Amino acid sequence: KMKVLLAIFIGGGFGSVSRYGISILGTKLFDTKFPVGTLLANLLSCIVLGFLVAVFQDKVNAEELKALLILGFCGGFSTFSTFSLETLNLMKAGQYWIAALNVLISILACLFILYVFVQKSKVI
């Protein structure tokens, strides 16, 4: 089990650093109060997660690799706590419509993307 824990640790580090890069890029590309960087990180994480879940679906002997990529990388790359904080800050600033839009787009788009990529990746 120590190999699995180490894999999660390493994957989580790479995922977190990648999320930070996406957040910085989103902020530079879009001049908006909407938290684009967090949304992009969550959407990309769902794409990666959907692909990986389908690829590893029947792979019983890939425990460390699944831990590295699914639990570690995707866990570090997705940003539910950041999403929640940004939504709360929008609400505190009185920007209720932007906060509601953030919740709606983030949840529906992530669920849709995850579904599509799980289905598409089964074909590969």
What are these regions (language model features)?
Residues 1-124:
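Membrane-interface helix-loop junctions in multi-pass transporters/channels
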